[in-house]
A protein has these predicted regions:
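Patatin-like phospholipase
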Residues: 1-3, 11-201
Length: 201
């Protein structure tokens, strides 16, 4: 089960990539592979490149045909409800799950509009239980709250989202059987160049 960046990694893992392959992929990926900047209109990033990248990596395998069961979480911005993608286009589901409000343009699928799943379910422990998981291992990658004044629009958005995620995550993490907390809290959501450091951790 993956939310936001977790859905990105989760989709690749569910397709069959092992930890070594995922690490190699993360080191080789460039911003230009997944980030398509656009004139701000509900977001700075379109998300089309991310969708295409995921579909290419999973050989266009739909969610329901993954080697390992996989579920991506997004938020229906119209109703505020948690949406679980359990079938269909994997790249589209991951794009919807990763659509950080104000950064990515919201993802429209079948008349509904979706944003980042972390808005309502940053860790998705309850979803994992609902879909039959006996043991839930959660990964907490929340950033340390920055006490500095944000520099610019993107910093303001990301800092606000980090605060929101931290508040919601704490309750969900308490319901996991095991919580892994890699020391990556000092790495901001937009610090793509620090991915090597995050992987080593």
């Amino acid at each position: 089960v993956g939310t936001s960046a977790g859905s990105f990694v989760g989709s690749l893992s569910a397709h069959g990539f092992n930890a070594f392959q995922l690490q190699k992929m993360a080191l080789e990926i460039e911003k230009s592979d997944i980030i398509d900047l656009t004139i701000p209109d509900n977001g700075f990033i379109k998300g089309e490149l991310l969708e295409k990248y995921v579909n290419r990596m999973v050989s266009n395998t739909p969610i329901e045909r993954m080697r390992t069961p996989f579920y991506a979480i997004a938020t229906d911005i119209g109703s505020g409800s948690e949406i679980v993608f359990a079938q269909g286009n994997t790249g589209m589901a991951v794009r919807a799950s990763c659509s950080i409000p104000g950064v990515f343009r919201p993802m429209k699928i079948g008349g509904r509009t979706y944003v980042d799943g972390g808005v309502v379910s940053p860790v998705a422990v309850d979803v994992a239980r609902r879909f039959g998981a006996d043991i839930v291992i959660a990964v907490d990658i929340s950033s340390d709250l920055d006490t500095r004044a944000p520099e610019g629009t993107v910093d303001t958005i990301l800092q606000s989202i980090n605060i929101m995620y931290a508040k919601i995550s704490s309750a969900q993490l308490s319901r996991a059987d095991l919580v892994i907390r890699p020391k990556v809290g000092h790495i901001g959501s937009a610090e793509f160049e620090k991915r090597h450091e995050a992987i080593l951790e």
